[in-house]
Every structure is written in C-alpha cells, then in structure tokens.
Swiss-Prot record:
GO terms for biological process: glucose metabolic process. This is Insulin. Pfam families: Insulin. PANTHER family: INSULIN (PTHR11454:SF9), INSULIN/INSULIN GROWTH FACTOR (PTHR11454). The lineage of its organism: Eukaryota, Metazoa, Chordata, Craniata, Vertebrata. PROSITE patterns: INSULIN. The gene is ins. Disulfide bonds join 9-38, 21-51, 37-42.
Length: 52
C-alpha cells in the first residue's frame, strides 16, 4: 500500500522523494524530513511537502 505511512531513512528517503516529486525536484532539509520520515513513519503526502 503506497499510501501507508512508513519509515524512510537514508537512500530510501531520497529515492522516495525522487519518485514523489518527479522532475520538479525537492529541497532536502535533512533535519526536518529525517525527524518526520525516519524517526517516525510518514506518508506520501508528507513527502510532497518537500517538493519544489
């Protein structure tokens, strides 16, 4: 289930951002997104907040 919140860390997190944001890219704010998506599970909608 792609919409289910999950823990994403390191390269998995970067890969997910590329998939979610596509050609527009994303701004990588390690502190914010690691706190939100690695330490706690996050959803695709959370990832979209980091797209440009």
């Amino acid at each position: 289930n792609a919409g289910a919140p999950q823990h994403l860390c390191g390269s998995h997190l970067v890969d997910a951002l590329y998939l979610v944001c596509g050609p527009s890219g994303f701004f990588y704010n390690p502190k914010g997104i690691v706190e939100q998506c690695c330490h706690k599970p996050c959803s695709i909608f959370d990832l979209q907040n980091y797209c440009n």
